[in-house]
Amino acid sequence: GYEDEDEDRPFYALGLGKRPRTYSFGL
């Protein structure tokens, strides 16, 4: 979920900050 830092970590590494879902990309 949004609070799962382990899930967000790959996206932080890509410079996206959070998972694409947090940007409403429809993923």
Swiss-Prot record:
Similarity remark? Belongs to the allatostatin family.
**Protein name in the entry:** Carcinustatin-20
Q: What keywords are assigned to this protein?
A: Amidation, Neuropeptide, Secreted
* Gene Ontology biological-process annotations: neuropeptide signaling pathway
Q: Name one GO cellular component term.
A: extracellular region
Residues where Leucine amide occurs?
L27
Subcellular compartments: Secreted
Organism source for this protein? Carcinus maenas (Common shore crab)
This protein's major location comes to: secreted
Q: What does this protein do?
A: May act as a neurotransmitter or neuromodulator.
